[in-house]
């Protein structure tokens, strides 16, 4: 029976991939208001680790894993926020290949969806939110 990857494997790969796209901008796995003192930074959250479940006689054909993670971009300058989002869109959307560096795994495709952009008056930060679904052959 085919198994899906451990969520920790996905977390390590996401951190590696995003950090390499936006270097030297810091990338964090979760948001903490203390980071808001930086002029720009990225956070991500793994929202879904999903593998189709089949019923019937053949249970070993599980299809592909389709984990989804949200990318949150924060920047004091609007142009920086939009440029960071563009860097991610250009690098990830439609990407196929090794994901997460040499210790990562192969993905058949990455789909990046722009959810929305906003501005937080309290923090003085422009915000852009993206969803990324990766297709991992099982």
What does each model-found stretch correspond to?
Residues 63-76, 125-136:
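Oligomerization/assembly interface segments of phage tail-like spikes and tubes
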């Amino acid at each position: 029976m085919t198994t899906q990857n451990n969520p920790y494997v996905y977390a390590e790969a996401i951190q590696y991939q995003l950090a390499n796209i936006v270097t030297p901008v810091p990338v964090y796995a979760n948001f903490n208001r203390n980071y808001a003192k930086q002029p720009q930074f990225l956070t991500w959250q793994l929202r879904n680790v999903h593998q189709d479940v089949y019923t019937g006689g053949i249970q070993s054909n599980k299809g592909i894993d389709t984990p989804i993670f949200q990318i949150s971009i924060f920047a004091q300058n609007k142009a920086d926020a939009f440029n960071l989002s563009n860097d991610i869109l250009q690098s990830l959307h439609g990407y196929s290949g090794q994901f997460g560096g040499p210790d990562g795994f192969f993905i058949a495709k990455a789909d990046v969806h722009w959810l929305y952009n906003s501005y937080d008056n309290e923090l003085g930060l422009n915000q852009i939110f993206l969803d990324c679904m990766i297709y991992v052959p099982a």
